[in-house]
């Protein structure tokens, strides 16, 4: 599990207007809520098909004081996926983890200036916490990825911010005309098969 979890895990309460105009309020404006079904999570998963979200209450965390992103390039999808599994089974507390295809790596590198090896699958691992904790975690990530044959490099500051902004906003406004943009949930073990299918 990544550091902050998903939207549904951060949601405490919400107000939704349903298709018939009725208003549904669910959850509570406190962290502890154990009464009845947790319908707000159902509305989050519906992606707007069950009603229009008009109000939401979220659990907040302070902005970490220190952040670093580790990059590693892999010659094959199998190697990069094995590294993902090792990271997820480790004690690393990741803020973000991105598994990047060669085509996406090329696009992101051209827009941000962040170095990525051509033709490689990449992993980007973001660690954010107090300085000592980040340094210790980066060292742990370096060891894990190094055991999978990857050369790891670290970015920070403006380069790090521009990279994650680009990843967040993909595919961006310059996506090819006529292309559809889809969101899909994939079981981690099936990621290599999905990548391969999309690259065909």
Language-model features: locations:
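Noncatalytic alpha-helical scaffold of FAD-dependent oxidoreductases
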Residues: 1-200
